[in-house]
């Protein structure tokens, strides 16, 4: 019997593309494990799917009657893109500053501006997708914070019953990735073929119009490699993350398949069944090909350090998975309520810190303090020339009580710069105005 694994000539050439793909995947993994989103990409896209038929599509048709099936499918791709846009900067060629601003500064105002600025069906779908990310992070991060504390007793002993992303980024990455993987293992998410059928699109023109209105900075000045960032993010969403999920599933599948039914889970599964149109649930993930098995073997023995830490996730416990399922139900309920407010032109979004779900204020969260200081410095460098009255009011309100323990105070030089920049802003700013009108 001939057991030759690789013969000369054509067989060698046939393995080269796979070797290149493995190398590419490993390289991008090294570059991309830094997201602070409450949910991973698959969950964000699933939130859109859960309300697509009953809520989102009717909104699109109400504003843009007569859409064809192809136009609706294309709009679905833009909704997917909007659902993950706040995390774009955390991927290769992105800008952490871009995503930090959307997470910690005027998070509600940004989504509101996308809705106001949208001009066609794809831009509108993109904005509605961004609204789903807002709902997801506000509802999802508190659950993830609690889950991290449950899964990591040492962190719970140090930080209490809720561990924030800034307090242990690796633990958050492992927990979030674990949640996505267990849902895939149990065939709950749309197949890769379905996501390929829909696609993934980013509305750059809408971003370019809305971003400077909200943050007083041109998009190109923050996201300097915009096309490369969007392209690499599209690859990560459509190929890398599903591939890494399959690899994780291959190494953890026995433990992940166990079910513990309860009311919250039954509600979640019922919602999944109602959104089950034109889908094959998860089959692409539970039948790994040869390439996935080889990559799984390689990564199984890779030291779980640095960017590979996320692949060493702890399987969710029944308690933490229940928290996750409840947070999904809460997210869907909240997103549905927001979409109804969009329909009735009554939408008002609070500016919340995405990592905690709490209203944004100074000294509430370290990354928020740091991000405000960086934005203030950037605006001051340009003499606040693009800062709207609303943005000026927002910054002055954030720094209205300088007695609280703002994170920036730990750097004396930087804090003195903040005080100087605030004086310059106060000299330019008119009296504070009332909050803006609802979005439509």
Q: Where are the predicted features?
A:
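Eukaryote-specific, cytoplasm-facing alpha-helical/coiled-coil scaffolding segments in long proteins
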Residues: 230-240
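A short structural micro-motif
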Residues: 134, 227-231
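Catalytic glutamate of the conserved HExxH
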Residues: 130, 134-138
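N-terminal, motif-rich segments that launch catalysis or mediate targeting to/interaction with membranes
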Residues: 36-125, 138-220, 250-254, 266-440
């Amino acid at each position: 019997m001939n057991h030759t694994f690789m013969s000369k000539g054509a067989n060698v050439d046939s393995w080269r593309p796979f070797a290149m793909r493995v190398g590419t995947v490993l390289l991008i993994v090294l570059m991309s494990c830094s997201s602070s989103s409450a949910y991973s990409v698959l969950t964000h896209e699933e939130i859109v799917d859960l309300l697509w038929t009953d809520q989102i599509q009717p909104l699109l048709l109400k504003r843009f009657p007569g859409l064809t099936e192809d136009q609706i499918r294309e709009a679905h791709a833009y909704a997917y893109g909007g659902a993950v846009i706040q995390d774009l900067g955390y991927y290769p060629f992105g800008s952490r500053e871009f995503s930090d601003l959307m997470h910690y500064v005027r998070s509600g105002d940004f989504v509101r501006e996308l809705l106001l600025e949208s001009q066609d069906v794809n831009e509108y779908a993109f904005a509605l997708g961004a609204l789903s990310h807002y709902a997801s992070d506000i509802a999802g991060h508190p659950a993830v914070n609690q889950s991290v504390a449950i899964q990591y007793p040492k962190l719970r002993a140090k930080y209490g019953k809720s561990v924030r992303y800034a307090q242990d980024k690796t633990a958050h990455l492992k927990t979030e990735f674990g949640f996505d993987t267990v849902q895939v293992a149990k065939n709950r998410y749309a197949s890769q073929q379905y996501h390929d059928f829909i696609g993934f699109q980013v509305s750059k023109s809408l971003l370019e119009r809305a971003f400077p209105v909200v943050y007083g900075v041109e998009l190109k000045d923050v996201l300097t490699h915009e096309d490369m960032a969007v392209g690499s993010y599209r690859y990560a969403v459509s190929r890398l993350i599903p591939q890494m999920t399959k690899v994780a599933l291959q190494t953890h599948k026995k433990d992940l398949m166990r079910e513990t039914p309860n009311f919250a889970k039954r509600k979640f599964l019922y919602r999944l069944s109602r959104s089950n149109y034109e889908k094959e649930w998860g089959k692409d993930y539970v039948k790994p090909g040869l390439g996935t098995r080889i990559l799984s073997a390689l990564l199984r023995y890779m030291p779980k350090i640095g960017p590979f830490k996320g692949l060493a996730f702890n399987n969710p416990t029944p308690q933490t998975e229940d928290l996750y399922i409840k947070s999904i139900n809460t997210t869907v309920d909240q997103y549905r309520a927001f979409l109804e407010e969009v329909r009735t032109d009554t939408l008002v979004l609070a500016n919340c810190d995405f990592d905690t779900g709490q209203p944004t204020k100074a000294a509430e969260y370290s990354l928020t303090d740091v991000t405000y200081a960086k934005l203030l410095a950037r605006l001051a460098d340009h003499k606040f020339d693009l800062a709207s009255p609303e943005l000026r009011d927002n910054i002055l309100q954030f720094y209205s009580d300088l007695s609280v323990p703002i994170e920036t105070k730990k750097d004396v030089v930087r804090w003195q710069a903040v005080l100087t920049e605030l004086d310059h802003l106060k000299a330019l700013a008119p009296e504070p105005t009332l909050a803006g009108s609802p979005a439509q």
